[in-house]
């Protein structure tokens, strides 16, 4: 155990046993942008032993207000390659794999198989639904995040016990990209996703079981609202 984790090992709910759990754990994050940057950064810093990331986009100047895995010199580069370099420089003691390809319904299960938890950190509902469908098929917990302006949400999904993304956001939901987003909103939601992943990996109580986390940065408040499975859901339902 290296000194880099010494301070978090002092946390009562973690300790050396918890750190060893993290070292043996695996998480994959779809998206290395505004949500993926904080989520991946803090999962790597915490010592999650096996990280994966998927992103087929390239770095644009308009990304730099919130996507801090990338810098000015990375504009035009593959986000997957840029994020991989940054994360390796941050923590060389963990395994990190990067996939520079588009995730689709057809390849999602193959790309996401074998991980303990899957994080969806993308702005496309089409991709989020593809991740969700794969997670239902694989039986893997899914943490989904979304942001818009000063607002954001986090959903923890693990059917058949908990609602899936499709139960809460029907497939007709807006797929509009290029909505306004503040860097601090993306940071708050991305860190919340990472924190929830750590709670799950450590076997600690999950406050988002059957709840949807809603964040309002304008009013500086967060709320948990009750959610339920849709038994007629075409993805996870029984009907």
How does the language model describe each region?
Residues 1-239:
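Adenine nucleotide-associated cytosolic modules
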């Amino acid at each position: 155990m290296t000194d880099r984790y010494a301070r978090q090992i002092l946390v009562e709910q973690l300790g050396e046993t918890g750190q060893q759990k993290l070292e043996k754990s695996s998480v994959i994050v779809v998206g290395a942008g505004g949500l993926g940057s904080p989520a991946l950064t803090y999962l790597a810093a915490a010592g999650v032993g096996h990280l994966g990331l998927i992103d087929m986009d390239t770095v644009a100047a308009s990304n730099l207000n919130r996507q801090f895995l990338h810098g000015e010199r990375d504009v035009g580069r593959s986000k997957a390659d840029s994020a991989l370099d940054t994360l390796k420089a941050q923590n060389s003691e963990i395994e990190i794999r990067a996939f520079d390809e588009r995730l689709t319904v057809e390849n999602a299960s193959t790309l996401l198989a074998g991980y303990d938890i899957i994080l969806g950190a993308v702005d496309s509902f089409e991709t989020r639904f593809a991740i969700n469908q794969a997670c239902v098929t694989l039986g893997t917990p899914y943490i989904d995040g979304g942001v818009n302006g000063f607002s954001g949400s986090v959903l923890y999904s693990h059917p058949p016990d908990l609602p899936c993304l499709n139960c809460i956001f029907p497939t007709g939901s807006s797929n509009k990209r290029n909505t306004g987003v503040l860097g601090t909103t993306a940071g708050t939601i991305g860190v919340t996703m990472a924190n929830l992943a750590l709670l799950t990996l450590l076997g600690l109580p999950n406050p988002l079981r059957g709840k949807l986390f809603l964040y309002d940065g304008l009013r500086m408040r967060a709320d948990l609202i009750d959610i339920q499975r849709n038994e007629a859901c075409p993805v996870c339902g029984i009907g």
